[in-house]
């Protein structure tokens, strides 16, 4: 195990109990809940994990909750996001009260319909990584549940019945299939695309921050990643803290998707996903 990764995981485990106590004592969103002028729902997809600990620490420091969508992606440390070595990180986030959904296990992109009851996909990772595959509903549902089962094995907690398609690419078919096996799709607001995957030469962090602060509204869902391979000037170290403080100054609170009006009825009617499902 590389020293940097070992230190990251040790920090995650060491701060979990302290973070849980702090979050439990805080009002939702880190400010007086009664004073909220609106709620923004921060969400993070996996990725290179280069900013994973910074993001966790920032959320903990501000005593706010977010929602994470998990796929088994390659990381900067040479392992994958759902390997055993990352269990302390995910356990610490779960202990803090964050919510979790599936991002498919092998980060599987929708590529188009392939005839009656069939859809073409391209996994980014795994045995079929980089190749097109054609799946029916049972195979697609199994792919969604793989992340849920792995999350339960690592944390002891069930995964929320939510999913996000890689790249946001889906069809009426895949959305219906996912609902049949217990997952509602979560997209993001136009203003909620925080731009961390865009080239920093054309989209500098300051411009992305100002755009988000001026555009986000009550109920908006944001989307960023726990690390992006291609961006030279990472987004999170420059923008996450000022985004949170800037929104707090405008009277916004933060919550997980468990509290989003669009998903509350679904979550109330559908059980969380465990390895036993």
Stretch-by-stretch model annotation:
Residues 21-24:
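N-terminal signal peptide c-region/cleavage motif recognized by signal peptidases
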Residues 1-15:
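Bacterial N-terminal signal peptides that target proteins for export
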Residues 169-215, 252-263:
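His/Asp/Glu-enriched short active-site or ligand-binding loop at hydrolase and phosphoryl-transfer sites
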Residues 43, 69-71, 101-103, 163-166, ...:
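A cross-family glycoside hydrolase active-site/sugar-binding cleft signature
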Residues 27-135, 143-161:
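Active-site beta->alpha N-cap acidic-glycine motif
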Residues 46-51, 72-85, 108-113, 162-172, ...:
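Acidic-and-aromatic substrate-binding clefts and catalytic sites of carbohydrate-active enzymes
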Residues 53, 57, 88-91, 138, ...:
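Solvent-exposed, polar/charged alpha-helical surfaces in well-ordered, non-transmembrane soluble domains
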Residues 29-34, 66, 76, 232-277:
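C-terminal domain-boundary segment and adjacent tail
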